[in-house]
Design a protein with these regions (language model features):
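Pre-Walker A adenine-sensing motif
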Residues: 5-18, 234
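Conserved ATPase-coupling elements of RecA-like P-loop NTPase cores
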Residues: 105-120, 144-147
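Conserved P-loop
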Residues: 19-91
């Protein structure tokens, strides 16, 4: 499914349910383009006449992502003073009127005193209010994959979302890049600032780690799609779960 078809499918879902529809972009690691893709979707929805607003977006200073924020309505963040510092959080109470809201950093832990402890709980409230949500999360923040990711990279990630959050999604989409493409983006300064690049290369961004994380992300999304098929298509239709393998030679003279 290409991007235009994906957005159209989401538009179709909007018309079918009173509860907001829920779309999650999954990434194997930071920098694959989840926020960029959400903002691209938002522009297409806006052009289609859908009332879409940004509830919370984290650009991480990435120029390409910041450029896409331009032209999109943004709900101002709530400012809270906590331990002597001003902290900005998503303003849940102000997200009342749009049809669709963009909410980044799904696994985020809210500052003390917020209505909910976790942002994914905010998202559940938004959905229950009849507002659709497009959000994003990396696989290391998914509870069911947390230990496997820790085995791969040797780092325990504290902020997590329960698997049931994914099970409630109407769409789960994997944002994929090859290891070479991702490392090229990192080294070009498109993911982290220069002083953080080497640390990233020594941890999550080792080539062998990326390959294993990519496999985990692909398997997770495939599992969610399979479960969605099983829960929505009647058994009497006799759906077959096919598996295909394509072998493509690197020799340009080989017939394709």
């Amino acid at each position: 499914m290409d991007r235009e078809q994906s957005v159209q499918h989401f538009l179709d879902l909007l018309k079918k349910s009173r509860r907001g529809n829920f779309k999650i972009y999954i990434g194997m690691i930071a920098g694959v383009g989840k926020s960029y893709r959400m903002l691209s979707d938002a522009h297409q929805l806006l052009e289609s006449g859908i009332d879409v607003k940004i509830g919370y977006i984290e650009t991480h200073g990435r120029v390409e992502t910041e450029a896409l924020v331009e032209g999109l309505p943004v709900i101002p963040r709530r400012k809270i003073f906590y331990k002597g510092k001003e902290i900005e959080e998503m303003d849940l109470q102000s997200i009342l009127s749009p049809e669709v809201v963009i909410v980044d950093e799904l696994a985020h832990t809210n500052v003390e005193g917020s209505k909910n402890e976790k942002r994914w709980q905010d998202v559940m409230d938004i959905l229950d209010a009849g507002i659709s949500v497009i959000t994003a999360v990396n696989i290391q923040h998914i509870e069911g994959l947390n230990e496997m990711v820790q085995d791969v990279v040797g780092i325990e990630v504290k902020e997590r979302i329960p698997d049931i959050v994914l099970e409630q999604a109407d769409e789960v989409v994997n944002i994929d890049l090859t290891a070479d493409e991702l490392l090229a983006r990192l080294k070009a300064g498109k993911i982290y600032k220069p002083d953080k690049i080497q640390t990233a290369l020594n941890n999550f961004f080792k080539a062998e780690h990326i390959l294993q994380l990519r496999e985990l992300a692909l398997k997770e999304v495939a599992l969610r799609v399979e479960k969605k098929v099983e829960s929505t298509i009647p058994e009497n239709l006799g759906v077959r779960h096919e598996r295909f393998m394509a072998c493509i030679s690197s020799n340009e003279k080989t017939p394709r």
